[in-house]
From Swiss-Prot:
Keywords: Hydrolase, Magnesium, Manganese, Metal-binding, Nucleotide metabolism, Nucleotide-binding
Entry EC no(s): 3.6.1.73
Function: Phosphatase that hydrolyzes non-canonical purine nucleotides such as XTP and ITP to their respective diphosphate derivatives. Probably excludes non-canonical purines from DNA/RNA precursor pool, thus preventing their incorporation into DNA/RNA and avoiding chromosomal lesions.
Gene source species: Salmonella newport (strain SL254)
Protein name per Swiss-Prot or TrEMBL: Inosine/xanthosine triphosphatase
Reported cofactor(s): Mg(2+); Mn(2+)
Cofactor descriptive note: Binds 1 divalent metal cation per subunit; can use either Mg(2+) or Mn(2+).
Assembly description: Homodimer.
Catalytic activities: XTP + H2O = XDP + phosphate + H(+); ITP + H2O = IDP + phosphate + H(+)
Entry-linked Gene3D superfamilies: 3.90.950.10
Residue numbers binding Mg(2+): 38, 68
Gene name of the record: yjjX
Domain of life: Bacteria
One Pfam family here: NTPase_I-T
Length: 171
């Protein structure tokens, strides 16, 4: 059984990690241990590079806390131009997989507040009345009318980031 350290305690992210690992390695193939670690970037990262740096930092910090694990996984959400997206970073001590999620365009009224320094989650909670929306369906669930959720979009990115770990051509 793979010991997987999730560099987050966010249920939406943990669900995506668990589902993706079980899809690739088989049901019951892993045990997820969530840990709260620092990203080293602002609460609301801007741009692809800052967001990816946050995910990489989280993986490194999780690895220092639990060096005996098989995998360390981080999902860092950010804002790039007028959209939200995330970077997924997965490390197994030998190689790393990274993938960027799909992007969701955000309305100007939301972006204005985020650009003024507020994090997307609290802004979305304010507009929707859904407490801790970032730990649930997220802006993705709201603006896709539930057709996608934060977790379902992250799931795809985790699957992509896992590609180097089960395909021999990457080695």
């Amino acid at each position: 059984m793979h010991q997987v350290i999730s560099a987050t305690t966010n249920p939406a992210k943990i669900q995506a990690i668990l589902q993706a690992f079980e899809e690739i390695f088989g049901e019951g193939s892993c045990h997820i241990t969530p840990v709260a670690v620092e990203s080293g970037v602002p609460e609301q990262p801007f741009g692809s590079e800052e967001t990816r740096a946050g995910a990489r930092n989280r993986v490194g910090n999780a690895r220092r806390l639990h060096p005996q694990a098989d995998f360390w996984v981080a999902i860092e959400a950010g804002i790039d131009d007028d959209a939200t997206f995330s970077w997924v970073v997965i490390d197994n001590g030998v190689q790393r997989g990274e993938a960027r999620s799909a992007t969701l365009p955000l309305p100007a009224v939301i972006l204005d507040r985020v650009r003024q320094g507020e994090a997307l989650g609290p802004v979305m909670s304010h507009y929707t009345g859904i407490d801790e929306i970032g730990r649930k369906e997220g802006a993705i669930g709201v603006f896709t009318a539930g057709k996608l959720t934060r977790s379902s979009v992250y799931y795809q990115a985790v699957i992509l980031a896992l590609s180097p770990f089960h395909n021999a051509v990457y080695r």
